[in-house]
UniProtKB/Swiss-Prot annotation:
Its EC number is 4.2.1.19. HAMAP family: HisB (MF_00076). It is an enzyme of class 4 (lyase). This is Imidazoleglycerol-phosphate dehydratase. PANTHER family: IMIDAZOLEGLYCEROL-PHOSPHATE DEHYDRATASE, IMIDAZOLEGLYCEROL-PHOSPHATE DEHYDRATASE HIS7. Pathway: Amino-acid biosynthesis; L-histidine biosynthesis; L-histidine from 5-phospho-alpha-D-ribose 1-diphosphate: step 6/9. PROSITE patterns: IGP_DEHYDRATASE_1, IGP_DEHYDRATASE_2. It comes from Streptococcus thermophilus (strain ATCC BAA-491 / LMD-9). Disulfide bonds: none annotated. One of its GO terms (molecular function) is imidazoleglycerol-phosphate dehydratase activity. Keywords: Amino-acid biosynthesis, Cytoplasm, Histidine biosynthesis, Lyase.
Amino acid sequence: MRQAEIERNTFETKIKLSLNLDAQDPVDIQTGVGFFDHMLTLFARHGRMSLVVKADGDLWVDSHHTVEDVGIVLGQALKEALGDKAGINRYGTSFVPMDETLGMASLDLSGRSFLVFDASFDNPKLGNFDTELIEEFFQALAFNVQMNLHLKILHGKNNHHKSESLFKATGRALREAITVNPDIHGVNSTKGML
């Protein structure tokens, strides 16, 4: 089974995360940030992976540390669960419509960290959630799993729909990339490693 459990404690956050790429349940996200919990649940469900997250952060400051640190730990868990990446597709792309919004995620589990984030939000807040933290989360995720991640909102107006489209698209693209392909022998790279 491709799985990982990671616990990370700092002065700002305490995070315990378990991930199983070959199971779909359970999915249980408890970060103390309701909107973020919703987005991570969508990510896991559309990525068809089991994800359990318990985070206690300094939410009296704001949710920045919690959101970023969950991205760090999730990236580390994905990297560990994927091991040497033998037999996986490596690449994944997904377009996800959400009413008037169309979002895209395209990624490469290359071992090279890079994020291109082409999405804007008309309001700085979604409820009490800072929309700038969406990019912070994906930056932390991409850099810690060591993947090249491109995210784009092709069109849309509603900020909730934009965010939901990006999280769903990333989950779906990741599922495509991590799927073991019987036609791939060894690692999907001319270098012989990722």
